[in-house]
């Protein structure tokens, strides 16, 4: 029966699964992108997204909670300093899973899981919006007319043939 099976056990005992997810989460936070199987990527997504949400509020309590899951002070520091600064305005969905095909050795479905805001290819098209200020009742200042420099004229000296 399938009662009470809320998440994928990944064919591992609880301690092994928790250690594996903690190591994968530390690698994801450090490298911003890792390759793994689809099942592990989905389990990692459920594991790491609440931690990223907690990192948006930098308190000692949240740091201790994240450290209890990650078990690496370097990953916690990186999470609260770099990752939280980038995802501060995003309401959720901090990771993206991209399927890569099958592994040659055992034909396992492979995927790449990455932090969304750290991919320059997908986010490269976004530009800062330039706000124009509108004034009520008055005209905007006109730009001063620019005077163009006179064109460089070269004097040609012609020596007549004698």
From Swiss-Prot:
Q: Where is the signal peptide?
A: none
| Residue ranges that the Swiss-Prot or TrEMBL entry lists as coiled coil | none
The annotated regions of Low complexity compositional bias extend over: 146-155
State the protein's name: Large ribosomal subunit protein bL17
Entry's Gene Ontology molecular function annotations = structural constituent of ribosome
Q: What is the lineage of its organism?
A: Bacteria, Pseudomonadati, Bacteroidota, Flavobacteriia, Flavobacteriales
Q: Which NCBIfam families match?
A: L17
User: Looking at the record's lineage, which domain of life comes first?
Assistant: Bacteria
């Amino acid at each position: 029966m399938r009662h009470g099976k809320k998440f994928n056990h990944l064919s591992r005992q609880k301690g092994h699964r928790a250690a594996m997810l903690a190591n994968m989460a530390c690698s994801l936070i450090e490298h911003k992108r890792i390759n793994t199987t689809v099942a592990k990527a989905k389990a990692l997504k459920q594991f790491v997204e609440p931690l990223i949400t907690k990192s948006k509020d930098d308190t000692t309590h949240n740091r201790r909670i994240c450290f209890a899951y990650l078990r690496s002070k370097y990953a916690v520091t990186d999470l609260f300093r770099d990752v939280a600064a980038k995802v501060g305005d995003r309401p959720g969905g901090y990771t993206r899973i991209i399927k890569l095909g099958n592994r040659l050795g055992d034909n396992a479905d492979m995927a790449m899981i990455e932090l969304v805001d750290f991919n320059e290819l997908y986010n490269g098209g976004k530009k800062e919006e330039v706000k124009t200020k509108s004034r009520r009742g008055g005209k905007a200042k006109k730009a001063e007319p620019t005077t163009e420099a006179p064109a460089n004229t070269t004097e040609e000296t012609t020596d007549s043939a004698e």
